[in-house]
């Protein structure tokens, strides 16, 4: 998958995490090839692409959204209700082709204001869901 990303983004300053050099301020894209880093990295990101949306079903889309990031993922997101809801709100994007990805992702790279706006919408959505466990607990306890 990383080779596909490297090919697709050829021409945009990019590096794999394991090959990064601290003195690379011109980087626009960092491909994460190490486990256990995402939560911390989302804090410094502008946009997130969440994996497994082309295979088994998208991974956690709430984590980057909670950090105020617009979220991208592949077409297999039936396992994530929040992904569906964020698509409806316009702060998350399911992509199924290179053309679809280009038409949605590249404008955000070129428009930081729009990126921040969509990220704020994603974060507001997650915050609006914060009391879901309080609503579910009585239902769970009532069925024990």
Where are these regions (language model features)?
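Nucleotide-activated sugar donor-binding and catalytic core shared by glycosyltransferases
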Residues: 1-144
């Amino acid at each position: 998958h990383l080779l596909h990303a490297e090919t697709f983004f050829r021409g945009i300053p990019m590096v794999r995490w394991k090959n990064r050099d601290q003195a690379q301020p011109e980087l626009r894209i960092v491909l994460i090839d190490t486990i256990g880093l995402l939560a911390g990295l989302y804090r410094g990101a502008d946009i997130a692409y969440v994996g497994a949306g082309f295979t088994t079903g998208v991974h956690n889309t709430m984590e980057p959204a909670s950090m105020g990031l617009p979220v991208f993922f592949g077409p297999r997101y039936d396992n994530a209700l929040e992904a569906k809801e964020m698509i409806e709100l316009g702060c998350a994007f399911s992509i199924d082709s290179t053309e679809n990805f280009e038409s949605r992702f590249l404008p955000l790279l070129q428009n930081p204001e729009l990126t921040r706006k969509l990220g704020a919408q994603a974060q507001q959505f997650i915050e609006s869901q914060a009391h879901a466990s309080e609503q579910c607990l009585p239902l769970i306890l009532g069925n024990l």
